Structure formats: C-alpha cells, structure tokens
Amino acid sequence: MVKVVATNKKAYTDYEILETYEAGIVLTGTEVKSLRNGSVNFKDSFCRFKNGELYLLNLHIPPYSHGGVYNHDPERPRKLLLHKRELKRLMGKVQEEGVTIVPLKIYFNDRGIAKVEIAVARGKKKYDKREAIKKREMERKIREYMKYSR
C-alpha cells in the first residue's frame, strides 16, 4: 500500500509533464519522521545535476518536533537515487531548451521507503494555462449538462 505524503499540484498547472521517474531520496532520521507526520512543502522545488548526481533543491521538510539538538536543516539539498542509465537519459533531456526536472509527489512505498516521483517537464506559457482552464471548465459543463439531461 502506497502512502502519498504530499503532491506538487502547482507542477501540474505550471508545467507540461513529458516523462516521469521514481527515485529514492537520501534522508536523515528526523526528516523521515517529519515526512511520516505529513509535513513537507514543494514550493519552488526543483532538481539539478551536480558532479553527475541529481539533487532535489528547495524542498522544505520542517524540523521534527521531538528532534532535539540533532535536527536537520529544513532546506538542505537532498540527493536522489536513480540508476546510472536513468541519470544519463535525464541529463540528455535537460540539455534541451526549456526542459527541467520537477518533483511531483513524495510517498512511502510498500516497504516503507521514502520515494520521490520526478518528472521531465517543459514550462507552460500563460496562454497555455488559460487554454487548459477553459478546456477543463467546458468538460465540467458538458458533464453537468449530460447529468441533468437524462
């Protein structure tokens, strides 16, 4: 049973999702406990390559309430764990103009291990967002009309 801790809803509105990957994440003990409490903030978080490794930046995991002196830095860069071939493929995709890697959700898998779903994404323009909203509204109105016309 997968337990989703948090979803990055803003990523779905601001980006066009091209491809998704599941990645492990290197966390300290207090970060895991804080995640199990369900507290995490995706605001402005993104992924970058550094020395051939992928890091998740600006992900805010607040300090654990019972952590004491050994608590973690809430904004520290966190290393993502992927297979070498996946890292090479991602590195190639990021070289393209306007393409970035964003986190979509954090969850605990069946074995209780924290995972991050990341996506290769392209930023949407303002008019693309408006079109998506119009399309969603029209579909909603059509469903509503069909529901009441029976």
Curated annotation (Swiss-Prot):
What is known about what this protein does? Required for rescue of stalled ribosomes mediated by trans-translation. Binds to transfer-messenger RNA (tmRNA), required for stable association of tmRNA with ribosomes. tmRNA and SmpB together mimic tRNA shape, replacing the anticodon stem-loop with SmpB. tmRNA is encoded by the ssrA gene; the 2 termini fold to resemble tRNA(Ala) and it encodes a 'tag peptide', a short internal open reading frame. During trans-translation Ala-aminoacylated tmRNA acts like a tRNA, entering the A-site of stalled ribosomes, displacing the stalled mRNA.
Q: Name where it's found.
A: Cytoplasm
Query: What GO MF annotations does this protein's record show?
Result: RNA binding
What superkingdom does the record give? Answer: Bacteria
Q: Which GO annotations describe the biological process of this protein?
A: trans-translation
This protein's gene is called smpB
Task: Give GO cellular component annotations, separated by semicolons.
Answer: cytosol
Family listed:
Belongs to the SmpB family.
Q: InterPro entries annotated for this entry?
A: SmpB, SsrA-bd_prot, SsrA-bd_prot_CS
Give the protein's recorded name.
SsrA-binding protein
Q: Which Pfam families match?
A: SmpB
List the keywords (alphabetical): Cytoplasm, RNA-binding
